[in-house]
A protein has these predicted regions:
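Short terminal alpha-helical segments
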Residues: 1-36
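Generic signature of intrinsically disordered, low-complexity, basic-rich segments
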Residues: 9, 24, 31, 55-57, ...
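Short alpha-helix boundary/capping elements
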Residues: 21, 35-43, 53-57, 89-92
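Short glycine-rich, low-complexity/disordered patches
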Residues: 26-30, 45-48, 94-105
């Protein structure tokens, strides 16, 4: 996967907003895996992947339905940003440790209480 920038995280969170809450963690991991696969495809064949783009998280995310960007104090949007960060972190840890078959732990998701 190409280097992850702020815009990649925002695009990923926007895509996750269109996914039902119970399926978001899996969707976040799939999004990161698709970006990685697209980058390997690009390097091997010298062209972008037809469905997942150029290997950036943003390209993979914007190829899916996505919601408009929300404010950072929106609890649902904040949870989606956290999930994208957790998915990237999980992907990096698996690459560094070489643990390919490990099952990912559920990320810690903060539930916001409105006052």
């Amino acid at each position: 996967m190409r280097p992850v920038l702020h815009g990649d995280l925002v695009a990923g969170a926007r895509a996750l907003l269109c996914v039902p809450r119970g399926l978001r963690w899996r969707a976040a991991r799939d999004l990161v895996a698709q970006a990685d696969a697209a980058d390997r495809y690009r390097r091997r064949l010298c062209r972008i992947h037809p469905d997942w783009g150029n290997g950036t998280l943003m390209a993979a995310a914007l190829g899916r339905p996505h919601a408009p960007e929300r404010r950072l104090d929106d609890p649902d949007y904040a949870d989606c940003l956290i999930l994208v960060l957790e998915a990237v972190r999980h992907w990096r840890q698996r690459r560094w440790t070489g643990v390919i078959g490990a099952r990912p732990a559920k990320p810690m998701v903060f539930h916001h209480v409105r006052r």
